[in-house]
From Swiss-Prot:
GO MF terms, alphabetically ordered: ATP binding; ATP-dependent DNA damage sensor activity; mismatched DNA binding
Residues holding ATP: 950-957
One cellular component term from this protein's GO annotations in UniProt: nucleus
InterPro entries: DNA_mismatch_repair_MutS-lik_N, DNA_mismatch_repair_MutS_C, DNA_mismatch_repair_MutS_clamp, DNA_mismatch_repair_MutS_core, DNA_mismatch_repair_MutS_N, DNA_mismatch_repair_MutS_sf, DNA_mmatch_repair_MutS_con_dom, MutS
Comp. bias regions, Polar residues: 1-11, 54-65
Protein name listed in UniProt: DNA mismatch repair protein MSH3
Keyword line: ATP-binding, DNA damage, DNA repair, DNA-binding, Nucleotide-binding, Nucleus
GO biological process, any: mitotic recombination
Transmembrane helix as UniProt keyword: no
Biased composition (Low complexity): 122-135
């Protein structure tokens, strides 16, 4: 046996790390109880005083302080203790610790640890007098006392910890540390044989239980022995059934972040857990073979939305059986059945209420949060599918792009095909308008230029305050023929496939326009031969039939057909393909009825977001948006970004706004009241179209539609002057009967509780539901009859079934009456006072009833989906909802127009733009100071090009932005901030302002400047409005002047209305002199006061005035910016010096020019008229150079 001193430190360190907690061993009377309640076997060993010695020799303990059996052989130190105690139970195999004994049948096991008692000393040790204890040194005694205090002098109550089955040497070391080394034993072992058989029996029973428990706790090597290699996880442990479920679903959804419902939590596993921990800020920890992270069920929808906003695809795995049903089912020992029931991306998430526990049945359903006027329009969450084809096979510079955009939440679909240049400006413009949340792109990649634009756009939200844009790569993009066949099958028009050709259906009416290479949908023939168009289809009451849908396919360009097939195939995975059902929702992006604002114009004019932080505050949509409904906010955003080109439509909107402002009649007030507490009807009806609405949602929709339809009586006639306003009272009554009929079909009380099984007011509407209910009623009747029998058996006339923890039809019997309970009854649960049972008959009937309940759930859900499909067929409900949104937008614009100083614009046929007392709409609202108005007039008589010069910070950029915004607002149909505005319809507003680089796209500041200018020159027409701010400043002075001069000269020849801001006076002077009928000079006025120190103090007047102004007063702006005075003084001196040098050079040039003129005059080589022209040119040069003849 190792010496005490050598072994004490190792034992001390071992127990210090493990920190065992041991229950004290106690004796009462003649019996001793070893309590194993905390261990899985839940056994208690009863020991009497006579047989305790032999029993202890068998139940050798790991932390016992008694000496073991005299025949126990000691183990070596290396085998006795693990070198790394953290290896826990896995390092110890009990059969190696306790040697097999002949009388013990080779049994090896472990028992609980016992705190030593003074009266128990093994008889194998000699008496103290015969064998004195070895003498200890002072250091050993001190260490001994500390150890004894640590073991015995604590609270006295040590909870039992799993034994590690230490060998006899360690046990002896523990006894010695406890001071029991020299104690003897009162047992002589004479009666051991009489107790031996019972002791062995108890020991074997306990040993078997403990071996089973220890085997369960052993790590991979022991547990996984005999398992197939694929069943063993990375930790060496076999995969659990739950882990196998996750792996099976993950194998089919590798690109999805999965949440698995486990009890009252949703869990992430593996790499998904690490991702969730990083993005959601939750803890991920290793658990068997995977990392695990979890969230509570009531927070699921919050975390799902956050993950979607970060660009992830999220799947939700739910339990398809309840705990109560599982307990009485045949698979009670198997894991819960689970499957992937929800799959979302940012674009396809349509606010599924089944994920939100916050939507109670008693609360009124709102499909969006309450609308706050002035807040941002709801995100469209658009999905955009893009394909392309190079125009020239030899080069990828120019491509033909096909684009389909679908908004799953509203069902709106936008499509387009267009040719794009090398820098993909057209594509960028469409992305800026559509603002997609997700892009569907071919996996084999697009052209390099296109990929660069898409990558930049997807990464831009980090800097523009938007959510991340997700990119989904699609395999196997179909060819045109395959895509056409796919769409044909989708619209169920197989009967037309043989008769409708892909290229010869009314070719003369569906030809490609050769001029702009764009397809347009012209009127086409329906089956009855009548002409129809997409605009007319929008107002068809019954929606668009599948036969008409297939006829529209031949009108779509080839790239659009391919994009649409890709989008529909992708949407099918989410169950949202019905968004393409109604072709009346199809709109072409670029058409002749709307102005196309480029992405640069949207940014420079701050249409959707400000340029300061990318937020809503200070933008045009912020100024105009006073909508009361979500659908109104979405429509207004579309209006603002796509101004009208149709004068009749513009006048209709302006007239409606004017009447709203002036009319306070009863009917107008009723029209305003329609918008109060209005849910998002468009989004709600779209969810009905998908079959994803809840009964509560559907009831809310129908109640709202009935309320709207009841506000106006049929055949009221025109109660308003405006045709737009009259659409509501004329259309609303037409949906009353339909809405009321659908509403009457529902049991409202059950609908509010989302009770699908009892939803229908007429039980015979869906007979399958009633048949299943009848079967359930038979089962319940049999259970009631069986209850009568149970009352007789138990002699309890008042006996009733009870339900506990979701388990129904329990028979509760007091403990005192359990003797009369038949042996066939199954005990389900118990308390201290009662037992609860299921009889065999109850088990059989409830199993049958459970099957009927599951069938009822399926049948009722199918019936509700069929009812939603029936509602969705009535497309006029969506049309009326969109008209409500139109009224909301008009009311919002009227509220803006009510501000002082706004006027109704006047449209004229001839090209003209005349603004009197115009103001910047947003600056006027943001600043407390009054805005200084401006006057401007563009016409053939007044010229179409205005060059604006003047000092920095004088208001040049603000003024030109205000002019462009007034044009945009006028063509939205809104009133404008001016005293008077007369204008013709502009087909585009093009702007080139500011200076910034695009490093991500490989463009310098000057390259960006020239690229934007190039796009403008390629798209403008004589009816465009162009704003160019300081073109040419990104390069050297000479190159900048040359580019500015050439560009402005070219634009002036086109004849479009142009505002050109520059600090190059030479350009302004030369062009105004060369083209006086088209170009005129203007500047922002100021006052200059000379100071005693030789400097000047500048006061900006912010007034637009005719004439040229050379001075920029850059040093004065530097003074306003707070630059140090020494720098300002140096800059002023250098500026004066450079100005003097320039004037000196000009004097030399003038002197040489005068000498040349006089020489030619006296030599009679120049005519008098030529001399006069030369003198005039010289005078102009002197004037522009601030050099007088006297100088």
């Amino acid at each position: 046996m190792p010496s005490e001193g050598s072994q004490q430190p190792s034992l001390d360190s071992f127990f210090k790390r493990k920190n065992p907690r041991v229950e004290p061993y106690s004796r009462t009377g003649n019996n001793a109880i070893i309590d194993l309640t905390d261990s899985p076997p839940n056994k208690k060993i009863k020991l009497d005083d006579e047989g305790s010695q032999k029993n202890r020799s068998m139940t050798q303990t790991s932390s016992s302080y008694f000496k073991g059996h005299p025949t126990a052989r000691p183990l070596s130190v290396d085998k006795r203790l693990p070198r790394k105690p953290s290896a826990a139970i896995q390092a110890y195999k009990l059969q190696d610790v306790i040697p097999p004994q002949p009388s013990h049948s080779g049994l090896a096991f472990e028992t609980c640890s016992l705190v030593p008692q003074a009266s128990f000393v093994p008889d194998s040790q000699p008496e103290p007098s015969a064998s004195p204890a070895p003498q200890r040194t002072t250091e050993q005694l001190k260490r001994h006392e500390e150890w004894k205090t640590r073991i015995l002098a604590m609270s006295g109550s040590f909870r039992r910890k799993r034994s590690l089955a230490l060998d006899e040497a360690v046990a002896a070391e523990a006894r010695e540390a406890a001071g029991l080394e020299d104690e003897g034993t009162p047992f002589d072992g004479s009666d051991g044989d009489d107790y031996k058989s019972e002791s062995e029996k108890n020991a074997e029973e306990v040993g078997k239980q403990l071996k089973k428990y220890v085997a369960k706790e052993l790590a991979g090597k022991g547990k996984s022995k005999g398992k197939k290699k694929e069943e063993i996880g990375p930790s060496g442990l076999a995969y659990t059934p739950l882990e196998k479920q996750f792996m099976e679903i993950k194998e089919q959804n590798r690109d999805v972040l999965l949440l698995m419902e486990v009890g009252y939590k949703y869990k992430f596993h593996g790499e998904d857990a690490k991702t969730a921990s990083r993005e959601l800020g939750i803890v991920a920890f290793p658990n068997r073979n995977f990392f695990t992270a979890s969230i509570p069920t009531h927070r699921l929808h919050i975390h799902v939305k956050k993950l979607l906003s970060l660009g992830y695809k999220v799947g939700v795995i739910t339990q398809t059986e309840t705990a109560a049903l599982k307990k009485i089912g045949d698979n009670r020992n198997a894991p819960f059945a689970r499957k992937l029931t929800h799959l979302f991306t940012a674009a396809t998430y349509v606010e599924d209420p089944s994920l939100s526990s916050s939507s109670s049945s008693s609360s009124s359903v709102r499909f969006d949060d309450p609308v706050v006027p002035g807040t941002a329009p709801p995100p469209t969450n658009a999905l955009v599918a893009i394909v392309e084809q190079p125009v020239d096979r030899a080069s990828d510079d120019r491509v033909k792009v096909g684009l389909v955009c679908v908004v799953p939440g509203t069902g709106d679909i936008t499509w387009d095909e267009f040719d794009d240049s090398q820098i993909r400006t057209e594509l960028e413009t469409r992305l800026a308008h559509l603002s997609p949340a997700e892009l569907l792109l071919p996996k084999q990649r697009l052209t390099k230029a296109t990929e660069k634009v898409l990558t930049y756009f997807a990464g831009e939200p980090k800097h523009r305050g938007r959510n991340a844009v997700r990119i989904e790569r699609i395999d196997n993009i179909p060819e045109y023929d395959a895509a056409f066949d796919f769409l044909t099958n989708f619209y169920h028009c197989k009967e037309h496939k043989a008769t409708v050709s892909k290229g010869d259906v009314n070719d003369e009416r569906h030809l490609m326009t050769e001029g702009n290479k764009q397809w347009s949908l012209q009127p086409k023939l329906s089956q009855d031969g009548a002409d129809i168009s997409l605009d007319e289809e929008i107002y068809l009451a019954s929606g668009v039939s599948s036969s008409k849908a297939i006829l529209t396919l031949v009108d779509f360009p080839k790239q659009v057909v391919i994009s649409m097939a890709v989008a529909i195939r992708y949407m099918k995975r989410f169950g949202l393909e019905n968004a393409f059902k109604h072709t009346s929702s199809f709109v072409r992006f670029a058409n002749r009825s709307h102005m196309l604002l480029s992405s640069n114009t949207l940014a420079n004019l701050e249409i959707y977001q400000n340029q300061t932080d990318g937020g809503l505050y200070g933008s045009l949509i912020w100024l105009l948006d006073h909508c009361k409904t979500r659908m109104g906010k979405r429509l207004l955003r579309e209006w603002v970004g796509r101004p009208l080109l149709d004068v009749a439509a513009l006048k209709a909107r302006a007239d409606a706004i004017e009447e709203i402002m002036e009319n306070n009649s009863y009917h107008m007030e009723k029209l305003r009241s329609l918008l109060i507490n209005m849910p998002d009807l468009v989004r709600g009806l779209t969810r009905v179209q998908y079959g994803k609405a809840t009964p509560n949602e559907l009831a809310t929709l129908l109640i709202t539609l009935v309320r709207l339809a009841s506000e106006f009586k049929p055949n009221m006639g025109n109660v308003f002057r405006s045709c737009l306003l009259n659409n509501i009272p004329n259309t609303l009554p037409t949906i009353l009967d339909t809405s009321q009929r659908f509403l009457n079909a529902l049991n409202l009380k059950q609908a509010r509780e989302n009770d699908v099984a009892n939803l229908w007011a007429d039980p015979d509407r869906f007979p399958d539901i009633q048949d299943v209910k009848d079967c359930i009623s038979v089962c319940e009747m049999e259970l009631n009859e069986h209850l009568m029998e149970l009352r007789k058996i138990l002699k309890k006339p008042t006996l009733r079934y009870i339900t506990v923890s979701g388990i129904e039809y329990l028979v509760e019997v007091p403990i005192r009456d359990t003797k009369i309970v038949p042996a066939q009854w199954m005990k389900i649960s118990a308390t201290r006072t009662v037992n609860r049972y299921h009889t065999p008959k109850i088990l059989a009937i409830t199993k049958e009833r459970t099957q009927h309940l599951e069938k009822l759930s399926i049948v009722a859900r199918e019936a509700f989906i069929a009812f939603q499909s029936e509602v969705a067929e009535y497309h006029e409900l969506v049309v009326v909802s969109k008209q409500i949104a139109v009224i909301d937008c008009l009311m919002s614009l009227a509220q803006t127009a009510a501000a002082s100083g706004y006027c109704k614009p006047k449209f004229v046929a001839e090209p003209e733009l005349k603004i009197l007392a115009g103001r910047h709409p947003m600056v006027e609202m943001l600043r407390e100071e009054s805005y200084v108005p401006f006057d401007i007039h563009f016409s053939k008589e007044e010229g179409t090009t205005k060059i604006i010069t003047g000092p920095n910070m004088a208001g040049k950029s603000s003024t030109v932005r205000a002019m462009a915004l007034i044009v945009c607002m006028a063509q939205i149909g809104s009133f404008v901030p001016a005293a008077s505005v007369t204008l013709s319809v502009h087909d585009s507003v093009q702007t080139r302002m500011g200076a910034s680089d695009e490093i991500g796209r490989g463009k310098s500041t000057f390259m960006v400047e020239l690229s934007e200018t190039s796009d403008i020159l390629q798209t403008i027409t004589p009816r465009s409005l162009v704003v160019l701010d300081e073109l040419g400043r990104g390069t050297s002075t000479y190159d900048g002047i040359a580019i500015a001069y050439a560009t402005l000269s070219h634009i002036a020849e086109i004849g479009c209305n142009t505002l050109f801001v520059t600090h190059y006076p030479t350009v302004a002077q030369d062009l105004a002199r060369e083209k006086p009928d088209k170009i005129s000079n203007w500047h922002m006025s100021f006052d200059e006061i000379q100071m005693p120190d030789g400097g000047a103090e500048i006061t900006f007047l912010y007034q637009l005035t005719r004439g040229l102004q050379e001075a920029s007063f850059g040093v004065w702006c530097a003074r306003l910016a707070g630059l140090p005075k020494p720098i300002l003084d140096t800059a002023q001196m250098r500026s004066s010096s450079l100005k003097a040098e320039t004037q000196e050079r000009l004097r030399g040039i003038v002197a040489r020019r005068v000498g040349w003129m006089l020489h030619n005059l006296f030599d009679n080589k120049t005519s008098s008229s030529q001399v006069l022209r030369n003198v005039e040119m010289l005078h102009n040069s002197l004037s522009s150079s601030s050099i007088s003849f006297s100088q």
